[in-house]
Amino acid sequence: MFCVQCEQTIRTPAGNGCSYAQGMCGKTAETSDLQDLLIAALQGLSAWAVKAREYGIINHDVDSFAPRAFFSTLTNVNFDSPRIVGYAREAIALREALKAQCLAVEANARVDNPMADLQLVSDDLGELQRQAAEFTPNKDKAAIGENILGLRLLCLYGLKGAAAYMEHAHVLGQYDNDIYAQYHKIMAWLGTWPADMNALLECSMEIGQMNFKVMSILDAGETSKYGHPTPTQVNVKATAGKCILISGHDLKDLYNLLEQTEGTGVNVYTHGEMLPAHGYPELRKFKHLVGNYGSGWQNQQVEFARFPGPIVMTSNCIIDPTVGAYDDRIWTRSIVGWPGVRHLDGEDFSAVIAQAQQMAGFPYSEIPHLITVGFGRQTLLGAADTLIDLVSREKLRHIFLLGGCDGARGERHYFTDFATSVPDDCLILTLACGKYRFNKLEFGDIEGLPRLVDAGQCNDAYSAIILAVTLAEKLGCGVNDLPLSLVLSWFEQKAIVILLTLLSLGVKNIVTGPTAPGFLTPDLLAVLNEKFGLRSITTVEEDMKQLLSA
């Protein structure tokens, strides 16, 4: 086992990365190794997808499957070894079908890629795990060095984050052939084990630029189906009655659940990155979408144990449900998996609803505590002139984008302390689950404009980017000249690709934490600092002083 993709990876003087019987996330060595094997199979599939496009062959089954299966290897998504192997077998079957299509056009069609003809050696998980050793990401570290390995992983993990957003967009009916062609090209190239530093750096920026387009179609998918988010108050306390909790990012799953629970007497609560769903008109119209439950994903083993109803996980993040003994009432959807947990293959939630009706639910309603969400792209752009006016009248000094992933490290209290230290004449724009560090606190307003503005999920960084570009255009300056600072927390691969997106767009002087990614060496961090001004957090006092004086 070798896995260094998330923030909680093991760090030792001898090197970084989980490499024992189990990773810090709870992923076993078996599952981790089989995910490496799956990625190799997906690289071979992409190699043939690139070749097929040369012949004008576009296989939509391949295009929809490839990023979805890649998403299953993202942190805290799928811990179920047999399902990972199932994805690998499906990848090979699709590859062979695509290969046959190519051979029908040109009898001598071939692909020069080491993954292009990969076959699984056995049905036995142990033998497959041994085969997977051939594809462990650090197998040639001694030959290429830590810097090249780090750049490879930056590209691989960044592309994995983009694949997750591609799947979210695809679920909502969004498809862009250029994006999929670019995805396959990059995925296939990474399967050749590239070792050119400049080429890898260029690839990381290409992934960031591609992801900006992915976030654009994801935004289009969400807003075309569910309307543009508008500011909405959400209750974060319990309402009496039977209940279901839904977590993850998949708004379509939430919509289907709301439709199927309407009139049943079962209330629905959002958790984690589902919180922004309350801002969408076509979702909040359901009166039994009664509120948001819990805090950051890392607290789920305590909070889910206390929730008196079933739980549905639609995407990341799931962690071991046996710890809180709620594994008999947590359900996985789509690419999510945990051994022994019931999985919903389709969009029928009747079994979940039946379980909710058999459980007690909340016995009484707590005193409501309301927070505000729903500052989506359209709302943010509508406030651009107000922001400019406040800045020109010196009522608004600075905007801090304070967002990203949450996690378990104690150092993450930095982000709470930072938020509460932001001066009263400054605004906090937040997104993703890092907001749970401070989103239930009171920040007041500046002439009626809330000082805490929740822009949505991690992918809604797109809205923040569009706002920044709009403000810069209106003020006749560059984005880096705005009174705007980005202080981002990271945990997994979606955060990595958001960072690559921002860097590829030329955004500089981003501050990140709580730690640097374990796969980035001091040399690589120095390169990123020199090229983009990217740096790690220090103390709240020092960072605040520096950012306000920039």
From Swiss-Prot:
SUPFAM superfamilies: Prismane protein-like (SSF56821). InterPro entries: HCP/CODH, Hydroxylam_reduct, Prismane-like_a/b-sand, Prismane-like_sf, Prismane_a-bundle. GO terms for molecular function: 2 iron, 2 sulfur cluster binding; hydroxylamine reductase activity; metal ion binding; peroxidase activity. It catalyses: A + NH4(+) + H2O = hydroxylamine + AH2 + H(+). Its EC number is 1.7.99.1. Binds 1 [2Fe-2S] cluster. Gene3D superfamilies: 1.20.1270.20, 3.40.50.2030. Its cofactor is [2Fe-2S] cluster; hybrid [4Fe-2O-2S] cluster. GO terms for cellular component: cytoplasm. The modification Cysteine persulfide is found at residue 405. One of its GO terms (biological process) is response to hydrogen peroxide. Its main location: cytoplasm. [2Fe-2S] cluster binds at residues 3, 6, 18, 25. Catalyzes the reduction of hydroxylamine to form NH(3) and H(2)O. This is Hydroxylamine reductase. It comes from Escherichia coli (strain SMS-3-5 / SECEC).
